[in-house]
Curated annotation (Swiss-Prot):
Similarity remark: Belongs to the PafC family.
Lineage top rank: taxon: Bacteria
Organism of derivation: Mycobacterium leprae (strain TN)
Protein name listed in UniProt: Protein PafC
Signal peptide start-end: none
Length: 324
């Protein structure tokens, strides 16, 4: 997970944690939650501005601090399962149906299951969400034969032969792969698999798999690879692509949710350092410039110089315009 995702999970768990451990000390809580005392205080500050609509006194999550101990005084309902209102149920169902119609993004079976559960809950609550949403889009979910074959191979643990389009090289190649798992990252689904040709783990984007055929042999990825954590380095299927070390200001930490990065870690001042792989210097230069001073290239030097020169050229063009 990204830094933001990890923190969100921790924030959601903090209120139930402190309710289950009343009067626990700051040091003990920080140790249990795996964060520093400074980060724990930042999490408290974040939770203090979260709560129920109205967002006034008595609506926000609150804690009582007595000496060095901590206790929850108002949970704002975060410790209980969410009960959807009728408009919320309708919104979720519409979003799920729209998401399901984007090829390769989600597993249709998972979407059907989620919709069925929400509709059932809506009926129990006496809502009219089921009838309201059914008229929006009742077409059955479907995906390409290639994507269906990929999901089946992952489920059955069978080897695959795929025709895959490489956007960086603009080529279509045929590969035999041993599926490991399906990953959902950002707006796309990826097949993580062992490439027999490259003898390494590669990611294959669903919408770039043109043809897929299940082979009559079991998947044979190395055991160490199967047990390893998911690899979400999007461009690992092309080892010739360069990588850049970036400094990212905390104010734009949402960048991790939109661009694939690895080796991300938080610095003492709250900013971040991460490594990002990219396809071309020109594209990377435009990306970094778009964030102003909030994202800076630390390495390689050639890319840093390119970004700096592009920024200077942009400033000079404004000066020329002003003089004219």
């Amino acid at each position: 997970m990204t830094q933001l995702s990890t923190r969100l999970v921790r924030l959601l768990n903090m209120v139930p944690y402190f309710q289950a451990n009343p009067r626990i000390t700051r040091a003990e809580a920080a140790a249990d939650l795996g964060v520093s005392a400074k980060q724990l205080d930042q999490d408290f500050n974040q939770l203090w501005v979260c709560g129920l609509p109205g967002y006034g006194p008595g609506d926000l999550i609150d804690f009582e601090f007595s000496g060095d101990t901590i206790e929850v005084t108002f949970s704002a309902g975060i410790d209980r399962p969410l009960q959807l209102t009728s408009p919320e149920a309708i919104g979720l169902l519409v979003a799920l149906r729209a998401l399901a119609n984007i090829p390769g993004v989600v597993d249709p079976e998972a979407v059907r299951s989620a919709i069925a559960k929400i509709e059932a809950a809506a009926v129990v609550m006496g809502n009219e969400a089921t009838g309201s949403v059914a008229s929006v889009d009742t077409r059955p979910f479907s995906e390409s034969h290639a994507v269906a074959a990929v999901r089946a191979a992952v489920r059955d643990k069978q080897a695959l032969v795929i025709d895959y389009y490489s956007a960086s090289h603009d080529t279509l190649t045929s590969r035999i792969v041993d599926p490991i798992r399906v990953l959902l990252v950002g707006d796309h689904s990826y097949l993580e698999a062992w490439s027999r040709e490259a003898e390494g783990v590669r990611l294959f984007r669903f919408d770039r798999i043109v043809v897929a055929r299940e082979l009559d042999e079991p998947a044979a990825a190395p055991e160490t690879v199967r047990k390893a954590l998911p690899d979400t380095s999007f461009f690992d299927d092309d080892p010739l692509l360069p990588s850049a070390t970036l400094w990212v200001a905390r104010s734009v930490s949402w960048i991790f949710e939109y661009y694939p990065m690895r080796q991300a870690h938080e610095l003492p001042d709250g900013s971040f350092q991460a490594v990002m792989t990219y396809a071309s210097d020109a594209w990377m230069t435009r990306l970094v410039l778009g964030f102003g001073s909030a994202v800076q290239v630390q390495a390689p030097e050639a890319l840093a110089y390119r970004v700096r020169n592009a920024a200077v050229a942009a400033l000079e063009s404004y000066q020329v315009t002003a003089q004219a």
